[in-house]
Amino acid sequence: MRTEPSDEGWVFQVTLSQGRAQTAHRVTVTREAYSRLSGGACPPEELVRKSFQFLLEREPKESILREFDITLISRYFPDYERQIRKQIQG
């Protein structure tokens, strides 16, 4: 995972591998979303890592959007925000 700071937060380049198959994803995380989802209890990278774990438990890597804002996950999985806060904040 590569992290690039942006004016509003961070941009993450995430590569998922399984065997020889790989998928690449670009995820944006605003400071506001980071604060709301993690409460500052972990680094932004950990929020993205746990978010991908959440997604991979529900769909194959090929189904994950190639580019998205982290808040979009809750549009497809309404329990995302509650679950990710529970994982991160305990």
Protein language model regions, located:
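N-terminal intrinsically disordered, cationic/polar leader segments
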Residues: M1-C42, S63, I70-G90
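Short helix-capping/linker segments at secondary-structure and domain boundaries
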Residues: L56-S63
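A short beta-strand-loop micro-motif that forms or neighbors metal/cofactor-
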Residues: E45-E46
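Basic nucleic-acid-binding interfaces
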Residues: R49
